[in-house]
Amino acid sequence: DNPFTYYGLQAAIYLKHDWAPQLAYSAPPVETKWQGSLTSRQTLSLWRLRALLEEGLIDYAREEAKFLALVKGNGAGIGQDDAKGALMMANLFSEAGNYMAAFSHAYAGLSLDPSLLNQTSASLIFPQPFLQDFQAAAERSGVNALLLVSVAKQESAFLPNAVSRADALGLMQLLPVTAKEVLPDSSRSDLFLPSVNTQAGGLYLYKLLDRFQGNIAMALAAYNAGPTRAAQWQKDLSEFPLMKEGFDPDVFIDCIPYAETRKYVGNILRNYAWYKLLTKDGTISSVQELMFQWQKAPKKQETAAKEAP
């Protein structure tokens, strides 16, 4: 029954839950004077975080937020045993650019008290940093900007300098060799620039969408596990009775043999649905209708992969 999970969202949409009244309301952030039951160490770190944010020292605030997110009290993250405290911390973490901590605290707060759901609190789980970069990448690649944001949220939690164990880089976690396929002049260091990384990510995702006839779930599986594996999974399922009448994302996701990819595809579809709800980019009657909601890029975009940004 949790609408912030893929299947919980599916159930809520199926039951025709209407979030419009709550999401139309933009509440101010939860009172930042909240103290709750904090340890002395948490209290000191929280004071430092607030002071750094007030002075506009975002880089230092981000480092303090990273430390604060790791400090535990009574077995829980700071504020996570109290709905308003969790949302207050989510807002501070978001201001500091620690979106991963913001996600988890906002999720905890809204799980404790669903009545606190509104445009402001939901946006702490589904923020849109670097939006101008994503919009520029969408214009160039032809892929919906909200889909690009949804991928970056899952890939890097919007951390521009993220580096994975496999050496995938930046917001959209691209391997340098993959980025070279679509932006031949890009360098490794370029991929830490949001403007370049989102362009490369958009162009590569467009390439996958084109290969899989605009099927978003298939393209996402390919983005995570590779196009060869995704194509094999598609082939394996082609004779499955439930797939003969049309593509069913639930069947496809449940049949993905890799647990990481199953979760990855479902989470991004959930992200995409919530971003559409929050930006009023259209009502959603089913997650299935998101499967082909992308516009094929005009011909002038077909040469974009050959050009440097």
Enumerate the predicted regions with their spans:
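Long, low-complexity, highly charged intrinsically disordered regions
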Residues: P21-L44
